[in-house]
Amino acid sequence: MSVPTVLERIIARKFQEVAERSARVSLAELEALAKAADAPRGFANALIEQAKRKQPAVIAEIKKASPSKGVIREHFVPAEIAVSYEKGGATCLSVLTDVDYFQGADVYLQQARAAVSLPVIRKDFMVDPYQIVEARALGADCVLLIVSALDDVKMAELAATAKDVGLDVLVEVHDGDELERALKTLDTPLVGVNNRNLHTFEVSLETTLDLLPRIPRDRLAITESGILNRADVELMAINEVYSFLVGEAFMRAEQPGLELQRLFFPEQVKKTVQPLD
């Protein structure tokens, strides 16, 4: 019998988690909370408008740890990081809420969103409509659907639930087959290409460049994972990719928002950093 991949272990845990959570808070209770939540801030629209101007549309991620790297950031205050990102020029935020593998928490999303005016995506592994309604109840503006974790019927069901509760959807793909499935099944404008293989956790920016010609112009290509330096950003810009999801490069920096500026808006760093006398 083959050993389950990291993604397979995470997904198995998610089904258990949904059962545990729905036993504590019913779907009807969650739906009431979702209706009472603050209005969505327009995650997709914010990215699309920024990218139209050929300016970096950065989804800045708030992530304490990962299965492949362990703890990434020791000093972890989500509200503080969110404010730093907003000052640094982020267009949107991504907050990890997975507890077991990423040391995330629902409250991190709430704390981050309350501290800023930016739209926020709940970064988690969605396998059930319950989690989608839960995301809206937490105040999220968008949810992530990972094609490699879902069949087409489930993907469509989750996207329909997201639409019902007013959430945008970012669909994430890693190869051509997944891209084809995503484009066929969903009408979301946000197509994320994860340069990290979620089964092996290996990273290659070539993944985005290979899939880019197959992403229609009426969709927004978002490159995810592996953007670590200015050369990576410039490589994407040459290929007309202006939307990014970046986490680790920022999380390892003492000042995440300043690192965001260095990577994406270096001319602003020159203006804000005064030379020593």
Swiss-Prot record:
Pathway: Amino-acid biosynthesis; L-tryptophan biosynthesis; L-tryptophan from chorismate: step 4/5. It catalyses: 1-(2-carboxyphenylamino)-1-deoxy-D-ribulose 5-phosphate + H(+) = (1S,2R)-1-C-(indol-3-yl)glycerol 3-phosphate + CO2 + H2O. Gene3D superfamilies: Aldolase class I. Keywords: Amino-acid biosynthesis, Aromatic amino acid biosynthesis, Decarboxylase, Lyase, Tryptophan biosynthesis. One of its GO terms (biological process) is L-tryptophan biosynthetic process. CDD domains: IGPS (cd00331). InterPro entries: Aldolase_TIM (IPR013785), Indole-3-glycerol_P_synth (IPR045186), Indole-3-glycerol_P_synth_dom (IPR013798), Indole-3-GlycerolPSynthase_CS (IPR001468), RibuloseP-bd_barrel (IPR011060). It is an enzyme of class 4 (lyase). Its EC number is 4.1.1.48. GO terms for molecular function: indole-3-glycerol-phosphate synthase activity; phosphoribosylanthranilate isomerase activity. Coiled coil: none annotated. NCBIfam families: PRK00278.1-2, PRK00278.1-6, PRK00278.2-4. Belongs to the TrpC family. This is Indole-3-glycerol phosphate synthase.
